[in-house]
Amino acid sequence: MGSQEIREEALNWWRESLHNLRQAKKNIEIDEYSVAAFLCHQAAEKALKALYIMMKNRLPPRGRDLIKLGRSVEAGEVLNELKILNPHYTIARYPDAANTIPSEAYSREITERCVEAANKIIDWVKKTGGLP
């Protein structure tokens, strides 16, 4: 891939990250807290993958582990936020992972913490990667 293609690919991941964060906030407004928590994870994952592409000049690895992905881009500054969001990829969607019904397990307070964590990660990625 050429540098222009790499930048375009990174921007695609970045734009989708921002879109997922907006979706998360809208889902909070309609009390869909488990969906919002999952979307916060997705926003963070896609932001980190955009940064990975910018830093490594290649496509990101497959996977959903935010901590592992964060380490690959030296995201120690937001490690606590990555730890907050990491479990929501599964527990926000699967009753067997949550040991309950996800749509009944989440509250506004929990999900707002997820949004705060995702915002902090996205702000860090923007600053670190020089993304718009």
Residue ranges and their predicted role:
Residues 1-132:
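Terminal alpha-helical segments
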